[in-house]
Amino acid sequence: KQIMFKVKDIKTNEIVQVLDTHCDEYGKAWFLLWKDKWVWRAADNYCPPNVVPKKRIIVAGGRNFKDYHVMREALDKRVNDFKELVCGGARGADSLGATWARTHFIPIKYMEADWQAHGQAAGFIRNHQMGDYADELIAFWDGKSTGTKDMIDYMQKLGKPVDVIYF
C-alpha cells in the first residue's frame, strides 16, 4: 500500500506513516500503520474528507427470506460502511445477514428476543432495543411481515436511515 499521509500519534508524539484510515461513529480518526498496527486516536474530531465514519447497521427482514444472492449483492455494496452488523437472531434475513458478516470479518452484535420474559411482545421489544442501539437499518421485506414493518417504522420514527429491499 502507498502512504496516504503522515500524522502525529497523540499517545507517543511520533510522526507516523498512514496506510489506511478508519473513523469511528463520533468522527474521531484511527490510522492504520505498517504491519496492521493501529495507532491510538491520532486526532480529535478529525476525519480525512475521503473517510466516512463506520456504522452499526441492522440487517433484518422476514423469516421467509432465503435468497442469499440478493442479500450478498445488496450488502457487498455497503461492506465498507459496517462497523458492526446488528442481528436479531431470527431465521431468514437475520441469520443470512450474520452469515454474510462472518464471511467479511465484520463483528456481529446479537440482540435476540426474550420470548420467555416478554411473550408475544418480545420481537417488538427487541426491535426497539436494536433501533436504539444501531445507526441504520437495511431491511429485506416482502411487504407483509409485521415484525419487519415495525423495525422499519421504529427506525424512521427515530430519524435513522432505512434502506428497504423488497422481495
Predicted regions and their residues:
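Flexible loop/turn and low-complexity linker elements, especially glycine-anchored beta turns
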Residues: 43-51
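Acidic/glycine-enriched connector segments
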Residues: 52-57, 64-167
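Short, Lys/Arg-enriched N-terminal segments with co-localized hydrophobic residues
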Residues: 1-3, 51-54
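Basic/aromatic-rich interaction segments and small domains that mediate binding to polyanionic partners
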Residues: 5-6, 10-44
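Generic structural signal for beta-strand residues in well-ordered domains
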Residues: 8-9, 25, 50-52, 77-78
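Short polar catalytic/cofactor-binding loops
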Residues: 12-14, 61-66
